[in-house]
UniProtKB/Swiss-Prot annotation:
GO biological process terms held by the UniProt record: cellular response to amino acid stimulus; cellular response to cAMP; cellular response to purine-containing compound; cellular response to starvation; DNA import into cell involved in transformation; establishment of competence for transformation; positive regulation of DNA-templated transcription; positive regulation of establishment of competence for transformation
Key word Nucleotidyltransferase present: no
Taxonomic superkingdom: Bacteria
Record-given protein name: DNA transformation protein TfoX
Length: 217
């Protein structure tokens, strides 16, 4: 049966209406459904939509009546245990379906970020950071990526502030985005306001004076 001609276009269109930026690619086990052309969150095969989920999300899908992907009829050895066929209960509710898809996409992106950061060791190899930033962090005892991830951007800036090692807001933006594997110049004004509030809370808990506004250096 030609699944694409009969189903995949409409399936893709429906999912696009729910979360936006959905496309599909022909796979040897059916069709992969992608968000923003790079994050494969679902598979369409044999008139069933399989959503990717692991851990807590997998448990949630199972409780909602979703069956795990077992075998591919064309390739009996091909198994995708982290994909679950969405139940009628989910498919009847656009709101629930959208919620689960968003959770799946978020989980995949978090796993990719985890994998990327795990491969890095030197601080200067992170986005936005240079050898100058690395040296400043090493001076306060943060010697590698794993330690920075553990302590977090806010507490790292606390240590920099206490040691007088250039704890600026620009450094903070760079640290936050480095741990998200993205360019700090892409931060919006609203994101900076939210992060500033978070930073001030941590600083005050550590007996430091917080920033009153974004340009209050």
């Amino acid at each position: 049966m030609n699944i694409k001609d009969e189903h995949i276009d409409s399936v893709c269109s429906l999912l696009d209406q729910l979360v936006g930026n959905v496309s599909f690619k022909n796979l040897f086990t059916g069709y992969g459904l992608f968000h923003k052309e790079e994050t494969m969150f679902a598979i369409w095969q044999n008139k069933k939509l399989y959503l990717r989920g692991e851990g807590v999300l997998a448990i949630q899908l199972t409780k909602l009546g979703c069956e795990p992907f077992t075998t591919n009829e064309l390739n009996k050895r091909f198994v995708l245990s982290q994909y679950y066929a969405l139940s009628d209960q989910i498919l009847r509710s656009n709101r629930l379906c959208r919620k689960l898809i968003i959770l799946s996409i978020k989980q995949i992106l978090e796993q990719k970020l985890e994998c990327t950061l795990r491969k890095l060791n030197r601080l200067k190899d992170l986005p936005n950071l240079t050898i100058k930033h690395e040296r400043a962090l090493i001076k306060v005892g943060i010697t590698n990526v794993a330690m920075l991830r553990e302590i977090g951007a806010e507490n790292a800036l606390v240590e920099l502030k206490k040691s007088g090692s250039g704890a600026t807001l620009d450094f903070y933006w760079k640290l936050v985005c480095a741990l998200q594997n993205k360019n700090s110049q892409m931060l919006s004004q609203a994101e900076k306001e939210r992060l500033l509030k978070k930073l001030n809370e941590v600083w005050r808990k550590n007996g430091l004076k917080g920033y009153r506004k974004l340009d209050d250096e």
